[in-house]
Amino acid sequence: MKPVRVGVLGLGTVGGGTLNVLKRNAEEIARRAGREIIVTHASARNLSRSRICDTQGISLTSDPFEIVNHPDIDVVVELIGGYDLAKQLVLTAIANGKHVVTANKALIALHGNEVFAEASKKGVMVLFEAAVAGGIPIIKAIREGLAGNRIEWLAGIINGTGNYILTEMRDKGRDFADVLAEAQALGYAEADPTFDVEGIDAGHKLTILASIAFGIPLQFDKVFTEGITQITRLDVEYAEALGYRIKNLGIARKTEQGIELRVHPTLIPKRRLIANVDGVMNAVLVCGDAVGPTLYYGAGAGAEPTASAVVADLVDVVRAMTSDPENRVPHLAFQANAIADIPILPADSIKTAYYLRLTAEDKPGVLADVTRILASHGISIEALIQKEPPKGETSVPIIMLTQQTLEKEMNAAIADIEALATVSGKVARIRLETLG
């Protein structure tokens, strides 16, 4: 059979890694796919810059539309990232009858419903394993490996930058701002780190995982996101003292009322495997009704880990190119006519336990006032730490773990506590999950 001709959009870190993997493992990949896969064309904004890959024999252009409109290209690999241009290129490729492989989580999370609808009309595939958790084949695991299960919940460390920052804060007692600056210097975080530290990047990925797990439309706008910027060294230290680790988790849970979709810092018991995933590594815990909890761990970013997922998608495309579109694995795991309209629950309906840290005057009656407010909202205390204030200080930090309560009750209780004259500043809140 004749080779499958591929056009790559973007020759940055992932694009270069993809070319290297395809070249180095060409024979093995062809044996798996049943046909040779050849990159014939590639686009890059700057054609003169040095690269991590060999582009000899590849037709290069600075105009990506030359590739998506080229009549001889069978598959387009989109690795430029971003929203508008990527969407335009992918939809053009689809309109021209080309299959698409992408690592673009923002594209899928925000525009995936439209992209998949157009792909179905044209009978082409759009695969996106590399969009979530880099080299971890988590999408294939949920979409195919766990197809016999009703997925009950999933929770994941799906942003390596945030995990690196929290790990450094814990292991070296460093402040958030200090570690963030280092992460930027090392290339783990962008110059504008908002997407990483405010939970937006993880929210994109959670949107995709939840859609595949529960058979719902992609709905990024309904994901609750809270970043790690307010986490302090004190929080990390007290969490450790209480037997927990702070991890920035993306959590999706199906309940009788609907589906929870949330990204936020979370206390996890130290004994959990996912609590011990450190540095820039990723991990996703998926619980199915038949299989129980399953954990997937690996590199969430990097040239070749992400390229591993891109190339795996290419192999899947080549294997299925000649099959009837009706017999292919659905884009979002469930058949298009079986996507369910299940409500996404508002954040204030979440029920969980909490870690609270507040600063109060060191005098009698203050703690009683705080516990009275919590009790008035039906909130019970599970554990409490109150240390002597430093010499010369009149305020003391109070740390509490609560039992499970509704988010809306906790919101009201925190507002009442912050209104006390004896309490200064904001009450720090971190949600707690046992993940059992």
Region spans (language model):
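N-terminal glycine-/serine-/threonine-rich beta1-alpha1-beta2 phosphate-ribose binding loop
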Residues: M1-N96
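Short, ordered loop/turn segments at secondary-structure junctions
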Residues: R45-L47, K105-L107, N113, A131-A133, ...
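Rossmann-fold NAD(P)-binding glycine/threonine-rich loop
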Residues: L85-N96, K105-R143
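A short hydrophobic/small-residue beta-strand
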Residues: H99-V101, I381
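Rossmann-like NAD(P)H-binding beta-loop-alpha module
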Residues: S120-D201, I208
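Substrate-binding/catalytic subdomain of NAD(P)-dependent oxidoreductase enzymes
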Residues: D178-N276, M281-A283, G302
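Low-complexity, glycine/alanine/valine/leucine- and proline-rich hydrophobic stretches
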Residues: H264-D289, A303-E304, A375-E393
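A conserved regulatory-domain signal marking ACT and ACT-like small-molecule sensing domains
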Residues: A309, L314, V318-G436
